[in-house]
Amino acid sequence: MFERLASPSWRSSVLAEVRFGPKALRGTVPWLLRTRLRQIDSLLQVALKNAAEAPHDLAYEMEHEHLTWSELANATSRVAHVLAAAGVKRGDVVALFAENSPFYIASVLGMTRVGATAALVNTNLRGRPLAHAVEVSKARVVLVSHTLESGLRECEELCQSLDRILTFDDNPYAGLLANTPATPYPQARVQAEDDFIYIYTSGTTGLPKPCRVSHARAILAGAGFGPLMYDFRPGDKLYCVLPLYHANGLLLGVSAAMLARVPMALRRSFSASAFWDDVHRYKATAILYIGELCRYLVNSPPHPKELPNPVRVAVGNGLRPDIWPRFKSRFGIESIREFYGATEAPGFIANISGREGSVGRVPLGGLAGWLRIIQYDVDLDQHLRDSRGFCIPCADDEVGELLIRVPKIAAGGLEYRGYTDESATEKKLLRNVFKKGDQYFRSGDLLRRDADGFYYFVDRIGDTFRWKGENVSTAEVADVITHNDGIEQATVIGVPVPNMDGQAGLAAVVPSGEFDPDRFWRAVSDLPAYAQPRFVRVMDGLATTGTFKIQKNDLKKEGVDPSSVGDPLYVRTKAGYELLNEERWLDVKEGRLKL
């Protein structure tokens, strides 16, 4: 530790952040104080405060829809009236299954208004995973957009706790909300420690798990990200194409902008061809990204409006080191602020100094042991411990699993909550790490830290991988595959593909007879598009460990190059699963065959 303190580069990087720090804290600390002194316990109260102080200022816009702060406040009241009429009361959970729109935000805050928790369901889910997401939240009512209603109806019988489905169309104010009372709905008593939303995350148990986010944590996320990452200024506008059912969109987008009273421009989903048109149309000065979005833009043909553009700052995560400088220079982005975190984690890392490729650093937190990287044996799938039974810290630039210390004492809704399922929460905790009785959150990610204290993402561990900006549970995909006739055994892994972000899904299967690619296509069609395997490897058997765990590491090392894999390989195309030969593999590598 003392050698690091003596390092000139480490000292200079700390000083750079100290110089930046007071500027950021001038925004962060006052907000924290104001929320404390004025007893603002929820984002609903922030929205109502904005409506009282700036009723005619723009809050949200999308295409031809514009919502001022006063109109947003009115919409939350009308949503609350509808929910109350459906029997929703304080302490209930309401599932929200809808695409991005200003009404989405009004719906979430309307649920707060009646004292309910909003379960934000991934719009890509269908069939059993969708039914599970609704059922595990214990929601009795689902608020769904008309474009997604049919998918929900198809699995309605699997949702045993579900009583009501409330559907809204493209103009909910003339439809679902048309006959609501004009009088404001009285606010339910909401405390900062109450659950605000459930955000679903995929993990090793397979199906989506709801992660609990309190009102306090939602406020803290926005209060920190607004000044620290965006450095919001008068006249700013945030453009968000990321789904609002994810933490990035709702907590790091909506919460941050609302607390700073910065308007947001939304889009239903990302479009590379329309991105710069929208940026100019909305005069967006800040954008929220995931790495895949940046890669799409960099690999897109030149757009007449890409330069000059009004974007000053881009905030997000997952930006690959090779894409970072190309994205910044091609589009003239003044500042890129990368971060690392997870919805269920008790902390995050932020890169406010702009070092390319890094997810950031926490100089004081790192010294205090808040973040630790420990030795992890990928082949044995276990942490290494010393003769005393404690974990072994990694040296500089040594790859290991990132751990985040769980505070022993926290209050006011800021304590670590994890998932609604206590057993799932328990699986994310590692105890007796460096001393008896301590506990850390397992990130499930491999990172390294350099001599200057900067952290770098390396890979995911085990049973999840990331593709198209979504976490894919290998257990969930394998479960769907093996539930269909024709497949005796299956395992799923993520494999890197040249010039692609994340990892593509590879299903290694042992068929009961001759492999039928059309039958396999039908078997995985209920999975979200991003979770459907891009590659299939047909094998005679799957090697297992002494404890009968399927050995995945050899499959990962061998990958999907047909010149080095002896088994038949298939690749997912628009026509279905087709044999992957060396010619098709070349098309994949050079981008002619889209995955």
Label the predicted regions.
Residues 56, 167, 181-200, 207, ...:
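Conserved pre-ATP/AMP-binding loop-to-beta segment of ANL
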Residues 35-40, 44, 56-101, 105-109, ...:
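Conserved AMP-binding/adenylate-forming core of the ANL superfamily
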Residues 68-70, 189, 196-220:
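Conserved AMP-binding A3 loop
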Residues 526-550, 567-592:
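AMP-binding/adenylate-forming catalytic domain of the ANL superfamily
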Residues 259, 281-289, 298-378, 419:
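Gly/Ser/Thr-rich phosphate-binding loop
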Residues 125, 132, 142-144, 404-532, ...:
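AMP-binding/adenylate-forming catalytic core of the ANL superfamily
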Residues 219-237, 247-285, 300:
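Conserved AMP-binding/adenylation subdomain of ANL enzymes
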Residues 2-19, 81, 85-86, 109, ...:
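Structural core segment of the AMP-binding/adenylate-forming
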